[in-house]
């Protein structure tokens, strides 16, 4: 079947979005490379934010001065930036593969607006725009770290985390219910069936980045708060654990309540959350200033509680995943229900359309008779 006008418009818009995505990726890559050289317009290197040698857990914040707080050290920030860039590269390659398979294929499919259906399921223009926002906000986040502005670091970390979250949700749900998602999957072009596994890998990779960004945004928020309010550094270190626990629990619950229906294999956030916990441990173990005071007991208990929460939700996800694999009939039953409902709706729509056409023909016959 020849592509319709809707398919042509949607394909061109989607292609333009992918072109902008590639340009944004190149821009962010060049920015990260150049930001390692302070004499090229950047005041400082982005990966050296906090001087842990000057950190004092018992000291209060001094207004108009930079107060060191718990944050990622230089090695962690470089690894974080490189990993995020690899995630961006993988997502960009995924979109390019989808674009080649949809735009360059000779068999356009037998369904009306087949390309539009495929683009909507694999990642439409809005999802591509959200990914571009995620890359842009990450670039601004590293730029604020280069200027060492605590308030802006906290703000851009939160904005980047929000954009990455919305992009992940759009990749998982495609803005539709579970039954509608199953129906669109059943109408997917046969040549894209294998790419769905690539899409599952991309979803989990983005969730790994999201899990580690939970640690980053918790540190950044407390880092900004601690440099703008008269609080102790030790209290802000403990606040990092509280913020991390709240955000991670919300995401764990969303995965178990909603997202697991769309993508069965979802261990990416759990893996990223584990790496985030390790990212919290490293600077605390590396620098004795964290443990040589009265906050040692509170920090130890906080670590224990966070690892317990992580282990509990990870075990729950593993049990539900393997139990779901054992009962394969549920998936096909839901697919049949979704298809039946969709066919019933389409049949009702066709009957109404046929009735409307018959009425118009009768009216035309009456007018011809009157003219005669």
Curated annotation (Swiss-Prot):
Give UniProt keywords alphabetically. Disulfide bond, Glycoprotein, Host endosome, Host Golgi apparatus, Host membrane, Host nucleus, Membrane, Transmembrane, Transmembrane helix, Viral envelope protein, Virion
Domain of life, per lineage: Viruses
* Alphabetical list of InterPro entries matching this protein: Herpes_glycop_M
Q: What is this protein called?
A: Envelope glycoprotein M
Relate the protein's function as given in its record. Answer: Envelope glycoprotein important for virion assembly and egress. Plays a role in the correct incorporation of gH-gL into virion membrane. Directs the glycoprotein N (gN) to the host trans-Golgi network.
* A cellular-component GO term for this protein: host cell endosome membrane
- Cellular compartments annotated: Virion membrane; Host Golgi apparatus, Host trans-Golgi network; Host endosome membrane; Host nucleus inner membrane
Basic and acidic residues bias: start-end ranges:
348-359
Residue ranges in the Virion surface topological domain are 35-79, 148-151, 222-239, 286-298
Segments on the Intravirion face: 1-13, 101-126, 173-200, 261-264, 320-372
User: What gene name is given for the protein in this entry?
Assistant: gM
How does the protein associate with the membrane? Answer: Multi-pass membrane protein
The uppermost taxa in this organism's lineage are:
Viruses, Duplodnaviria, Heunggongvirae, Peploviricota, Herviviricetes
Instruction: Please give the family membership noted in the entry.
Output: Belongs to the herpesviridae glycoprotein M family.
Q: Where is this region: Disordered?
A: 348-372
Q: Does the keyword Transmembrane helix apply?
A: yes
Please indicate if the UniProt record lists Acetylation as a keyword.
no
| Quaternary structure (record) | Interacts (via N-terminus) with gN (via N-terminus). The gM-gN heterodimer forms the gCII complex. Interacts with host RAB11FIP4.
Instruction: Please give the organism.
Output: Human cytomegalovirus (strain AD169)
Q: What is its main location?
A: virion
Q: Which intervals carry biased composition (Acidic residues)? A: 360-372
Q: Name one Pfam family in it.
A: Herpes_glycop
Residue stretches spanning the membrane? 14-34, 80-100, 127-147, 152-172, 201-221, 240-260, 265-285, 299-319
